[in-house]
C-alpha cells in the first residue's frame, strides 16, 4: 500500500484527510502568550482568525517536530507500506528538510519525497492529484514522477486584503510591499520557483477579481483533469465570484472550496482569497 503524507500547510483538515486516505502532520502556531496551537487541530480557522484580529504581535509559525515524522515512517515500515511525502515549498519552510531528515534517522526504505514548490491551495491540489493517481493504480515511482511533471503546470493566485500580516511575517517581497502601499491597491501574489512573487495589482475588490481572472487566462486556463481549488480566510462569500466566473466563462466544473488554515492565514491575513489550478498543459 502507498501511504501519502503531507503537512497542514496543504490546508487539508482531519475529516477530509481521512476521506482522501492521507496523513497530515501539523505545523505549529505560537500565540503572543506562548500558547502553541497545532494547525488544523486545536482551533478551527474561523476561531483562529478571531484571535488573530486581536493580536498585537503576529503569531509565529514553525515546522513540525521530527518525532512526528519518525513515528509515521516506523509505522509504515512495520506494515510493509510505501510512503510518498508531499510538502510545502522548501523555500518557505524547513518542513521538507525535517521530513527527509527524519526518514534518514530511522533508516527506512520505500520513501519518496516531492517538494510541491507551492503552498496552501497549490500544495493541497497536488496532494489530491496524488490520491487520484494512487486510485488509478500508479506505482510509487510513477506517482512521484507524475507529480514532478504536474507541478510545472500548477498555479496559485491570491488576492491579499491587508499586507501587514505578510510584512510582519517577513514573507513580503519588495515589489509587493510597494504595490500594497498604494492607496486602495490590492496586490495579487503567486508562487514562483517556490517563493512568494508578485502576480499583478488592482484597485479595489472588484478590480482584484478581474485581475485574478485575467491571470488565470494568462497562465493557460484550467485543466479539466483535476478540479480547481478556491480558498478564503474569513468568508466563503469571497470566492463566490470565482466560482461563477469559472463556470460561466471557462465552462469549468465547480471548484472545490476550502477555508485557508491557521499557518498560511497567519501570513495571508483575514480577507485573503485565491485559486489553485493546473493549466491546460497538464498531461496525465
Language-model segment annotations:
Residues 3, 9-23, 28-30, 35, ...:
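Mixed-charge interfacial surface used for oligomerization/domain docking
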Residues 35-85, 89-108:
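Class I S-adenosyl-L-methionine
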Residues 1-2, 80:
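Local beta-strand N-terminus motif with an aromatic residue
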Residues 1, 59-60, 86, 117, ...:
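Short, contiguous strand/loop micro-motifs
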Amino acid at each position: 500500500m502507498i501511504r501519502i503524507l503531507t503537512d497542514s500547510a496543504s490546508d487539508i483538515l482531519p475529516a477530509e484527510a481521512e476521506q482522501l486516505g492521507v496523513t497530515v502532520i501539523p505545523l505549529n502556531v505560537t500565540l503572543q502568550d506562548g500558547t502553541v496551537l497545532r494547525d488544523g487541530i486545536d482551533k478551527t480557522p474561523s476561531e483562529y482568525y478571531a484571535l488573530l484580529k486581536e493580536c498585537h504581535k503576529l503569531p509565529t509559525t514553525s515546522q513540525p517536530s521530527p518525532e512526528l515524522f519518525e513515528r509515521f515512517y516506523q509505522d509504515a515500515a512495520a506494515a510493509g507500506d510505501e510512503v510518498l511525502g508531499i510538502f510545502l515549498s522548501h523555500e518557505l519552510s524547513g518542513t521538507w528538510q525535517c521530513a527527509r531528515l527524519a526518514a534518514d534517522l530511522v533508516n527506512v526504505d520505500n520513501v519518496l519525497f516531492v517538494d510541491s514548490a507551492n503552498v496552501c491551495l497549490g500544495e493541497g491540489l497536488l496532494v489530491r492529484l496524488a490520491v487520484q493517481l494512487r486510485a488509478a493504480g500508479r506505482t510509487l515511482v510513477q506517482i512521484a514522477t507524475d507529480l514532478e511533471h504536474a507541478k510545472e503546470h500548477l498555479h496559485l493566485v491570491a488576492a491579499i486584503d491587508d499586507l501587514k500580516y505578510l510584512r510582519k511575517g517577513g514573507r513580503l517581497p519588495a515589489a509587493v510591499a510597494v504595490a500594497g502601499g498604494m492607496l486602495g491597491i490590492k496586490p495579487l501574489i503567486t508562487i514562483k520557483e517556490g517563493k512568494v512573487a508578485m502576480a499583478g495589482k488592482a484597485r479595489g475588490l472588484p478590480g482584484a477579481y478581474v485581475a485574478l481572472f485575467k491571470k488565470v487566462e494568462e497562465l493557460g486556463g484550467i485543466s479539466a483533469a483535476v478540479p480547481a481549488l478556491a480558498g478564503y480566510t474569513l468568508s466563503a462569500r469571497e470566492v463566490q465570484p470565482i466560482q461563477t466566473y469559472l463556470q460561466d466563462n471557462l465552462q469549468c466544473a465547480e471548484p472545490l472550496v476550502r477555508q485557508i488554515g491557521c499557518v498560511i492565514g497567519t501570513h495571508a491575513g483575514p480577507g485573503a482569497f485565491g485559486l489553485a489550478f493546473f493549466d491546460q498543459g497538464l498531461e496525465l
